Design a protein with these regions (language model features):
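Conserved alpha-helical substructure of the radical SAM core
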Residues: 2-123
Length: 124
């Protein structure tokens, strides 16, 4: 099966070297209409977001990763985002997380950053 062959190739590549970064588009949802957004024209398409299980499979097969970039739409609209961060920390030894946000949910971001700093202390 093509998928198994791809996963096998991906695993062997990662056994030899570490990925610098992975970019994860966690949601197509957004609570704003920013003029400069690269995704604004595609928001109306209502494509399905990756499930947590699909993201878990990515994490389990990716090997060690230096930086995790999460984007979207608006990443803070994804309720399971803290679990996604923690999973990549455990499975992939990420050292940095980068997440652009429109800043419309500051209390949620502050809560998540505190949780992340507690559960993933050596990650920025």
């Amino acid at each position: 099966m093509k998928t198994k062959r791809t996963r096998s190739s991906f695993r062997s590549m990662n056994s030899e070297r570490k990925l610098e970064s992975i970019f994860l588009f966690v949601t197509g949802k957004c609570n704003d209409k920013c003029a400069m957004c690269f995704y604004a024209n595609d928001m109306a398409k209502k494509e399905k977001d990756l499930t947590f299980e699909e993201i878990r499979k990515i994490s389990e097969t990716a090997g060690e990763i230096n930086k995790l970039w999460v984007s979207g739409g608006e990443p803070t609209l994804r309720e399971d985002l803290p679990e996604i961060f923690e999973m990549f920390y455990r499975n992939n030894q990420i050292k940095d997380v980068n997440m652009p946000t429109n800043g419309l949910k500051p209390d949620r971001v502050i809560e998540w950053v505190k949780r992340f700093r507690t559960n993933c202390p050596d990650c920025n």
